[in-house]
Amino acid sequence: MLFVVASHGHCFDGLSSAVLFTRLMHERGLSQAKFEYKACGYGMNQQRNDEKLLVGDENAILDYRFKSSPKLTWYFDHHRTAFPSETDRAAFEAAHNPHYFFDATYSSCTKLIADTGKKRFGFSDPNLEPLVRFADIVDSARFDSPEQAIDRSDPIMRLVSVVEHYGDDGFYAQLVPDLLHKPLAEVAASSAINERYKPLGKKHERFVERVREKSEVQGRVVFVDMTDTLLESVGKFVTYALFPESVYSVLVGVLKGGPKISVGYNPWSGQPLDADISAICARYGGGGHPVVGGISFAANDVERARLVAREIAKELAG
């Protein structure tokens, strides 16, 4: 039996969701099934949850936008932008599928799967509780400080960076079994993860310095235009550490897959959240959560990405 699990790629919550979901399916008697993992993204060159991916006897989509399909047998998500249109939401509701779960009040998809597994299926695995807890911290940015959020001295935070950089199909196929059978701390401290992190550490340091150089303070917003060179990744919390009094950040850069805008709310600013970032990003074809979101553009749309980023920064500046 083939079970295809399409989850959010290059994302610690996406990876952790795949681990929890696989463990839940094992508990439901499918331990002998072949699990095939697909890492989905929203960048121009990243795979989507298309029909061509849903080729299993069972198919799941996790931590990613809903896809109406008779082939889809399981669905878990917590993003407010899970449904690209009202038609998609209507299809979700009309399906009345007891294995479709959506709850935007959850701060991570991993926690949604863990709680649903316990309430609906009587499933819990104490060995995976550290993974659930940390995935929830990362996806909700519930760190004690912005400095902690960008500190990479903790092996688990180094693992987060590795997942965000390398998290494709092959990486998920390797890491999901590892995290199913080994403690999170052991996987994070493994030589394989350390070797993958080595080049990322220097890149992270350079990224912090470039953010410092390129940042513009626009009232309560920090705007960063980094489109002059190719970025390896877009860090979510660097501006909050560099500008602790900022309330929002808008960063635009060019990744391998094309331009991307990252928008976020600084939870350590001491100021209330007064905008729905997911709704703002959705207006431009992106999505996310009330406190963080992103928008991807085609490779030749750099100038439009820069224009949109400035529009959003102006809106959030009030």
Predicted segments, located by residue:
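Glycine-rich, Lys/Arg-enriched anion-binding loops that position phosphate/diphosphate groups
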Residues: 140-233
